[in-house]
């Protein structure tokens, strides 16, 4: 946590303001600035970042065909001016070690992973299962899974994380493609998808569906 924090930001996911007065240390890994720093770390430690990342996603989802949507990756690159600004801003604070374009290319590909709701739910199962995937492989330690679940609970929905906790009561993570994955530790993982996003960047109907799920079943962490 020297390069990325673990606190909620309370600001929009692509904000530069907080990053400036906190000297280039993103509040958490789920806002864009934090994800870009994590991408930089992976570029530093992986021999073939894009290939290794797609292999990891296939491993945790249990689907050998899960891959990048190259049209989406190109679209992200063509319109990713705010992310380019964030990466250069992070670089100015010494919190990006690799070439900016290399980091951005990897990040845009991460944003373009394409999968079904079932594959997304399966990919998140190890967070619900003390770090063990559906195929029985230990991906994380139980302690690491607990900490990531805590991060998802407090930071997984940008500046709407409190609202999601209040209404749904599960650790979860939203994506700009309209997907949401959530977990009930030691019980299950679940995913929703609807592309209509609210003003906070989260799937409106996905959040509603998960609220109905936990309300009607009484299954939440609270």
Predicted regions and their residues:
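Active-site-adjacent helix/loop patches that line small-molecule binding or acyl-intermediate pockets
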Residues: 1-110
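Catalytic-loop motifs flanking and including active-site residues across diverse enzymes
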Residues: 30-37, 116-122, 186, 209
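Short glycine/serine- and small hydrophobic-enriched flexible loop segments
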Residues: 39-44, 125-129, 215
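Penicillin-binding protein/beta-lactamase superfamily catalytic region
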Residues: 77, 88-147, 200-203
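Short glycine-rich loop/turn motifs
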Residues: 85-87, 120, 177-180
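Structured C-terminal helix/loop/strand segments within mature extracytoplasmic catalytic/sensor domains
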Residues: 128-222
């Amino acid at each position: 946590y020297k390069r990325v924090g673990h606190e909620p930001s309370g600001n929009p996911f692509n904000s530069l303001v907080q990053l400036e007065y906190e000297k280039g240390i993103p509040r958490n890994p789920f806002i864009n600035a934090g994800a870009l720093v994590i991408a930089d770390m992976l570029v530093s430690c992986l021999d073939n970042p894009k290939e290794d990342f797609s292999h990891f996603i296939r491993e945790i989802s249990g689907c050998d065909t899960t891959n990048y949507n190259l049209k989406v990756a190109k679209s992200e690159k063509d319109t990713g001016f705010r992310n380019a600004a964030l990466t250069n801003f992070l670089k100015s604070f010494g919190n990006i070690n690799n070439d900016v374009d290399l980091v951005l290319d990897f990040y845009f590909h991460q944003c373009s992973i394409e999968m079904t709701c079932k594959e997304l739910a399966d990919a998140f199962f190890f967070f619900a299962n003390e770090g063990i995937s559906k195929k029985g492989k230990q991906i994380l330690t139980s302690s690491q899974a607990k900490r990531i679940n805590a991060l998802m609970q407090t930071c997984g929905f940008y500046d709407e994380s409190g609202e999601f906790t209040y209404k749904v009561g599960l650790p979860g993570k939203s994506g700009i493609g309209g997907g949401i994955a959530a977990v009930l530790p030691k019980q299950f993982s679940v995913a929703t998808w609807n592309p209509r996003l609210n003003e906070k960047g989260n799937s409106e109907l996905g959040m509603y569906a998960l609220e109905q799920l936990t309300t009607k079943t009484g299954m939440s962490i609270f």
